[in-house]
Design a protein with these regions (language model features):
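Carboxylate-rich helix-loop segments that flank metal/cofactor sites and access channels
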Residues: 69-122
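Amphipathic alpha-helices that form helix-helix packing interfaces
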Residues: 30, 37, 44, 67, ...
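Alpha-helical bundle segments that constitute or directly flank the non-heme di-iron/ferroxidase center
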Residues: 16-48, 109-133
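Conserved alpha-helical segments that form or flank metal/cofactor-binding pockets of metalloenzymes
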Residues: 52-88, 157-161
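Alpha-helical scaffold segments that form or flank carboxylate-/histidine-based iron centers
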Residues: 22-30, 51-69, 107-114, 136-150
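Aromatic (phenylalanine/tyrosine) cluster motif
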Residues: 9-10
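Preference for long, well-ordered alpha-helical segments
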Residues: 110, 117-161
Length: 161
C-alpha cells in the first residue's frame, strides 16, 4: 500500500519529479489562462461605451492580474520560467475578437463573448485539475480560486445578456 510512503521520507525520486512537473504545468496553465482573460478584456474594453460593462471588465481584469502575479511568484519559487501565451495564440484570439465585433459592438454581444470565454476558462481549469493530480495543495488552491472566479465571471456576464 501507499500508507508508509506518504511522509515524503521514502518517496521514490520519480514521484517527487512528477510533483514538480505537475506543479509547474498547472502554474503555467494558470499563467496562460489569466493572461488570455486579461488580454481579452483589454481588447474589448476599448470597444464599449457602456460604463457598467466597463466597470465589470476592470474588476475582472484586476482579479486576472492578481491571480497571474501569484502564479508568476509560485513559478519563481520553484525556479521555473513563466511561459505566457504565444504570439500566435494572442494573434488568433485578437483576430477572433475583431471578426466577432466588427459588425456588432453591443453590450449584449460583448457580454456573450465574455461569458463564453469564462466558460471555456472554467473547462480549462477542470481539465488541468484532472491532468496534474500531483500538484501541491497550494497550487491546486490557486487553480480552484481561478475556477471559482471564472464561474462567477460567467454569471456576471450573463447579467448583461
Amino acid at each position: 500500500g501507499k500508507g508508509c510512503t506518504q511522509g515524503g521520507f521514502f518517496m521514490p525520486e520519480n514521484q517527487n519529479m512528477q510533483k514538480t512537473s505537475d506543479n509547474e504545468a498547472m502554474l503555467q496553465e494558470i499563467v496562460q489562462n489569466t493572461e488570455m482573460g486579461k488580454n481579452t478584456l483589454d481588447e474589448l474594453m476599448g470597444l464599449t461605451y457602456d460604463q457598467k460593462l466597463k466597470d465589470e471588465m476592470m474588476r475582472q481584469k484586476n482579479e486576472y492580474r492578481r491571480l497571474n502575479q501569484q502564479a508568476h511568484t509560485a513559478l519563481d519559487a520553484i525556479g521555473a520560467q513563466a511561459k505566457g501565451q504565444s504570439a500566435a495564440a494572442r494573434m488568433s484570439v485578437s483576430m477572433g475578437i475583431r471578426t466577432r465585433t466588427m459588425l456588432d459592438k453591443s453590450t449584449r454581444n460583448l457580454a456573450t463573448m465574455l461569458a463564453e470565454g469564462s466558460g471555456q476558462g472554467v473547462l480549462d481549469c477542470k481539465r488541468a485539475e484532472t491532468d496534474y493530480p500531483q500538484a501541491s495543495p497550494g497550487v491546486h488552491k490557486l487553480m480552484e480560486e481561478l475556477c471559482a472566479f471564472q464561474t462567477g465571471a460567467e454569471q456576471a456576464w450573463r447579467e448583461f445578456v
